[in-house]
Amino acid sequence: MSTLNKLQRPARSWHRKKRVGRGQGSGLGKTAGRGGKGQKARTGNMRFEGFEGGQSPLQRRLPKFGFTPPNRTVYAVVNLSDLEQHFDAGATADVETLRKVGLVKGRYHGVKLLARGELTKKVTVVVHKASEAAKAAIQKAGGAVEEIPLVAHKPESAAKAHAGKGVKAPRQPKA
């Protein structure tokens, strides 16, 4: 068994740093591997990706399209196969337990249940949204689905301002 203090890189698994422009004998003298003269041989060769030699580039010829709505609702997706794998019969799968078992990771506005896979166990599911097929499959297995409303998110500062807390009073002029 190998130990950490005996680990070694495989032979020839790294390259020596190229020292360019240091004489003809090195093989990388004179033009330093940049070929002859021209824009690419100069320093500051900053043509952007997509440059077409002065012709109007493709990304400027085509129109802009679409956008990402800043206030969209993003759901974490949980499938029936996930419930089958992580929960025993008679269990309750709510948002908190879904996070604990690792089915919901990261920040989402809510959890949505979809019908991919099969469910044979009686499970009670408490989520924000569920597809009709998922509801039917859970009820067929003897379980139940409860949909809870999404909590409207207010930033802390907006909530404080709305409650009248943390709002500074106007400064009084000096007498």
Swiss-Prot record:
Region (Disordered): 1-65, 155-175
GO cellular component: cytosolic large ribosomal subunit
Gene Ontology molecular function: rRNA binding; structural constituent of ribosome
Low complexity: compositionally biased ranges: 160-169
Pfam families listed in its UniProt record: Ribosomal_L27A
Keyword terms, alphabetized: Ribonucleoprotein, Ribosomal protein, RNA-binding, rRNA-binding
Gene Ontology biological-process entries: translation
InterPro entries, A to Z: Ribosomal_uL15, Ribosomal_uL15/eL18, Ribosomal_uL15/eL18_sf, Ribosomal_uL15_bac-type, Ribosomal_uL15_CS
Biased composition regions of type Gly residues, renumbered to the chain: 22-38
Listed Basic residues bias regions: 12-21
Family of the protein in this entry: Belongs to the universal ribosomal protein uL15 family.
Subunit structure of this chain's protein: Part of the 50S ribosomal subunit.
Function comment: Binds to the 23S rRNA.
Protein name (database record): Large ribosomal subunit protein uL15
